[in-house]
Amino acid sequence: MCSSDLPDLKMLCALSDALANIPEAELRLTPNETAFIINLTGEEAQKVLALTVGGAETAFEASVSCIGGQTCQVGTRDSQGLLAACVAAVREAKLPADALPCIHISGCPSSCGTHQTGAMGFRGASKLVDGKPQAAFTFFLGGNSRQGQEAMGRELGVMLEERIPAFLVELGQTVAASGMDFDAWRQADPDGVERVAAPYLA
């Protein structure tokens, strides 16, 4: 299941109906807001997989987002809406599957989207433009939740919400042009993300 783009109700209903007819089948949720379906035979797994076509196909499309300000009373920004816009922009740009990492988005400082522990993260914020507050997100880079490699992301600045999809597309295009995947590119060019992000943080 894709955590970055809510599946339509038809998909969820079809999945529920299929699992109801499979003894011992279980759906388990993870801290990264993804789901695993367990206790399936090979044939059952193929049927369930066919029901989830159109969900997350890449690490980026499996990005994590809290429920966001459209639902949460505490959330200041629409993190789900931002992620859906980013996934749509990246799909339209037809970037290679490994050009962008899984990102984490929280609508506010409560950190429900664990923005500090993602390779890249965004936290809901505001930015003054011509003296008026505009929807924005604070950008974090370099977080890691892997055991033995734990790190909190560094705060790089505030980016207008409307500019984030374009930033991610440009970043993905830059990575793709290198012929490397995102992780290899970051190792080869440690300042690359900051360089691409700079105009969007201005």
Predicted features, each with a name:
Residues M1-S3:
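Conserved small/polar residues in nucleotide/adenosyl-binding loops
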Residues D5-K132:
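Small-residue-enriched alpha-helical segments and adjacent helix-cap loops
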Residues F36, F60, F122, F137-F140, ...:
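Phenylalanine-focused residue identity feature
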Residues T41-G42, S145, G192:
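Intrinsic-disorder/low-complexity, polar/charged segments
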Residues I67-T71, R146-M159:
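Short beta-alpha connecting loops at secondary-structure transitions
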Residues S110, N144-Q147:
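Short Gly/Pro-enriched loop/turn and capping motifs at secondary-structure junctions
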Residues K127-G143:
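Gly/Ser/Thr/Ala-enriched C-terminal appendages of enzymes
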Residues R154-A202:
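Extended hydrophobic packing segments that form well-structured cores
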